[in-house]
Amino acid sequence: MTDLVIRPLAVGEEALFESLPDPGLVGFAAFGDTYSGMAAAGEYRPDWTWVALRDGVVVARAAWWAGPKDADPLALDWFDFTDADAAAQLLRTSPLYAQYSLKLPPGWRDIPAVREQAQARIDAAVAAGLSPLVERFRYRWTPDCGVPARPGRLEFRPEPDDAAVLDVFRRIHQGSLDVHVRRTIAATGLEAAAQEELDYLRWLPSPREWWRLAYNPAGELVGLSVPGRHYGDPLIGYIGVVPEHRGHGYAYDLLVEATHMLADEGVDRIVAGTDQTNVPMAAHFARAGYPIAQERIDLI
């Protein structure tokens, strides 16, 4: 067997990346996206796109994504191969690291061919040193889903002071069901987790003025609702309720408010997500008319 060559793409080598045979059952390909199309739109950089070749033939590929101003990749979201060992070696050899987010069709475990493709990628990522963290639901709202009526229980106010919002994150993160948040708290503490959330919202290329704090009729803070825009889609950027007001379904009110704000902007879609283990939030998305468009497995 000839030696494996692992390297980043050169400019103009998109066709080489796409020469790998792939049935398109998982990942972006399962949803009609192509690497060349996304790269042309500025989603990927050649030096963050790697291939493993044997005798000049691509046997594994990986592409890391980030926003246009980011200095480091934020996600590994193309990872395909015909040789699992080469794929694991590619991830170990590349100097790049980010969470691997494997996109899957809803109910993927019930489709044998899809389940096989998904498990192969998980196994290769684990062989490279990654570990499964959480499975998530990904939602896609469109105007045909309808805009749910506002419950009218809360008052929503803008909050321009980042320090005030950071303090809200400190409160919301206490007892959070979000697996990523819980992991960050365990690793680096509550303050770091709160700052990470604020940094993410500041990173989004959507107006800061959209952020809303929610208050009950007694004037008590209930939570935070943030509609936003990613580099690709309008999205629900954040929904969170402070511990003392949990158990009353207020996350639904926050979700509805964010949906109304984006709908009023005339968007034709809203994407959102939650951990599959966050049963209350998943129920709120269902009640608000958000259909599950994808499932996703995150490995770190």
Identify the role of each PLM range.
Residues P21-G24, D33-W108, P217, G223-P234, ...:
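Conserved donor-binding loop and adjoining core beta-sheet/short helix segment
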Residues A84-Y97, V241, G247-D264, V279-R287:
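Conserved acetyl-CoA-binding loop-helix of GNAT-fold acetyltransferases
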Residues A60, V134-E135, V222-G223, Q294:
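A structural microfeature
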Residues T82-P160, L299-I300:
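Acyl-donor-binding surface of acyltransferase catalytic domains
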Residues L96-A98, D268, P291:
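Short acidic/polar active-site loop segments enriched in Thr and Asp
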Residues I239-V241, T274:
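Hydrophobic adenine-recognition pocket in adenosine-nucleotide-binding enzymes
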Residues A30, T34, A149-P234:
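Flexible, substrate/cofactor-facing loop regions flanked by secondary structure
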Residues M1-D3, R7-L25, L133, R138, ...:
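A short, well-structured alpha-helix characteristic of acyl/acetyltransferase catalytic modules
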